[in-house]
């Protein structure tokens, strides 16, 4: 049966059958350009491809002389094919990339690390804010980056504060100011919130900051020198001194920056592969120096060529069909991408990247001089990263094997989850759920739960809450939990950080699920001195106690998982506690309602300023009497 749907953008055609009839499909499939998705009998997308002529490309899969083993295996699993017609080949390339990201088909080259890079963002505000941004570019403003790490962004922000007095505070803090904050006193902000600088002068500093972030520090100095001379000629000596200080700081920065050569802005893509794995190492060259680097380990079908891998990486890493309606990105795509060999669609990819970046983007292969050296360095780093990863993986796999020797699970151990509870005197309770597989921590599957609706301090109830959050969906389909998706997959082992009571609560919970396969539940009890190496494992059911030698790889794995669970829980708890404490200090004072609390924060400029204020300053706040000011001061200083 042929199903057609048409809208203004694309045209979909689908044939579905228990046994795929390729002849019937090829008789009706279009010859236009587009993207095709192949499904198996479970309606799972197993491959996504694109073609200038869909009919011709799809017919090639069903010839008798298909040479590729991968293609032969793929064709045997096809139960349905869906095609999407596009207007151009470039549109097909973008759509293919997005479908691959969405469906993660097992026969495609997959770049699984889709974590967004951090950017510096200058917001589109009357008084723009300079700050770190990560995630979708939904905030209006100009984005500068990407940066390889968050640390690199913070380093840049600290540097920017020394040169340009642009605010870095949140808009809510900015709106609440009635007097300059500490950053203004330190010379790091011009206090636009309280009109210490005109809109035009602030805009001037913002524009200079943008030039600096574009790598044009010499142009910034030229403008500052001109303005310093103008201010001096007009006898505005204080303003001239400020420009002079900016120039001095900028010159120091220029001297400190190591210029590695004549290459200003490019990404260098290194590749190394062994028999089963591939590593791609990306070097970021910005403002004539190596800004940072990152390694990727894509999932690659065994017969894929280096050229195919590089093309898939460039498409998945750089291309996006999400046109930025709110923000303008500066340098998110470099002006040049260097790779070690040519790729089939180099012209089309370069055109699409140029269109997306709004400037010319070049993809270079035959490189010499500095670019060749960078490419060699990227390849060396890819090799090193793969060797390091394999060493870590071998160590982790050995620990999994050692742990299975302890528990003797028939099908081995593939996935382990661990739960921990963190709170302070029963308040701000947070539960963590960390996941490990044979490659180590699976951080994309980590979950943290804010626990509520229980008696404060009841760790057993908190554990039941967390288990229900994690596995509660399985109650709807206890027969086949694996059909709930990756995040609902049952682990082979569930570690419970705690003693017999916590373990009993977990046993009670899982007994209610009536699953066809229940994970092995194990309590991890700390020794009397709580020193590492003295942990005792408690098996569910028999509650048998197992103590492993301090040198045991199995124990090291348990400690690693337990420590990671504890770290993840306590990090969340501390953040929650800090957030609550900021509010609770004033809320706990009798006679201070919402209006007076807001008056204090707005008039004085925030909680820190309220705590630092003396009784006289507190009494100046509208609605706060001298008696109440004294009461507030005493409460905040525990008198």
Swiss-Prot record:
Keywords from the UniProt entry: Cytoplasm, DNA damage, DNA excision, DNA repair, Excision nuclease, SOS response
Any single GO BP term: nucleotide-excision repair
Pfam families: GIY-YIG, HHH_5, UVR, UvrC_RNaseH, UvrC_RNaseH_dom
Signal peptide (UniProt feature, chain positions): none
Domain of life: Bacteria
Keyword Isomerase attached: no
Subcellular location: Cytoplasm
Segments forming domain GIY-YIG: 31-109
Domain UVR: residue ranges: 218-253
InterPro entries in the cross-refs: GIY-YIG_endonuc (IPR000305), GIY-YIG_endonuc_sf (IPR035901), GIY-YIG_UvrC_Cho (IPR047296), Hlx-hairpin-Hlx_DNA-bd_motif (IPR003583), RuvA_2-like (IPR010994), UVR_dom (IPR001943), UVR_dom_sf (IPR036876), UvrABC_protein_C (IPR050066)
PROSITE patterns in the cross-refs: GIY_YIG (PS50164), UVR (PS50151), UVRC (PS50165)
Tagged with keyword DNA damage: yes
GO molecular function: DNA binding; excinuclease ABC activity
Listed GO CC annotations: cytoplasm; excinuclease repair complex
Listed HAMAP family: UvrC (MF_00203)
Family assignment from sequence similarity: Belongs to the UvrC family.
Role played: The UvrABC repair system catalyzes the recognition and processing of DNA lesions. UvrC both incises the 5' and 3' sides of the lesion. The N-terminal half is responsible for the 3' incision and the C-terminal half is responsible for the 5' incision.
Quaternary structure (record): Interacts with UvrB in an incision complex.
Protein name: UvrABC system protein C
Gene: uvrC
